[in-house]
Amino acid sequence: MKTQVAIIGAGPSGLLLGRLLELQGIDNIIIEAKSPDYVLSRIRAGVLEQGTQNLLREAQAGERMDREGQVHEGFALSFLGRVERIDLKALTGGKTVMVYGQTEVTKDLMAARAASGSVSI
């Protein structure tokens, strides 16, 4: 049986889904109403949790993220003159977050899609 999937939207989620399906041999097409330049102009969040980092690596689209992203193992809270550091890595069994902009994630996924010859319209 041959499976084909249509994905609506070429944002990070749609592009990541398309890439993961492609790597499993599942044909897919991404349908986006806006131009690639418009999609890349949408500036949004830029903190990636561990699961998202892992998925980007699994999708073979995490190389630049690993080079350029800023890993954070914790953060500080300040209240009434007292500062407490929250050690995310220690409290979560080694998980971290990474600062790497959504626009950069989208660029990486678009590049991987273009390199593979997969179709987006």
Name these PLM-found stretches.
Residues M1-S13:
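Beta1/beta-strand and adjacent pyrophosphate-binding region of the FAD-binding site
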Residues I8-G11, E32, G101:
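A secondary-structure boundary/capping signal
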Residues G9, G25-D27, G117:
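Glycine-centered short loops/turns at secondary-structure junctions
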Residues E22-I43:
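Glycine-rich FAD pyrophosphate-binding loop
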Residues L40-R44, E49-S116:
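Active-site-adjacent segment of FAD-dependent monooxygenases/related oxidoreductases
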Residues I121:
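General small-molecule cofactor/ligand-binding pocket signal
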